Amino acid sequence: MSAEERLIELEIRVAEQEKTIDELSSVLTEQWKTVDQLSKKLNALTNRFLELEEQAAPDVPVTKPPHW
């Protein structure tokens, strides 16, 4: 294999790797958006649950665990 053929092969590999990196970056961005949306929904549901729990048993104090 000549030096020129090796150079061409390396350029092809670099181009393929750049494409893969771009695709993975796009997927990762979408996943972070999904995680953020799910986190917001979970927080809203947690708050709603605590409200309903307080309404169901108003004499029993509801306290969030320290990690909330």
UniProtKB/Swiss-Prot annotation:
Pfam families registered for this protein in UniProt: SlyX
InterPro entries attached to this UniProt entry: SlyX (IPR007236)
Transmembrane regions: none
Domain of life of the native organism: Bacteria
Protein family membership: Belongs to the SlyX family.
Name of the protein: Protein SlyX homolog
Organism this protein belongs to: Brucella canis (strain ATCC 23365 / NCTC 10854 / RM-666)
Gene expressing this chain: slyX
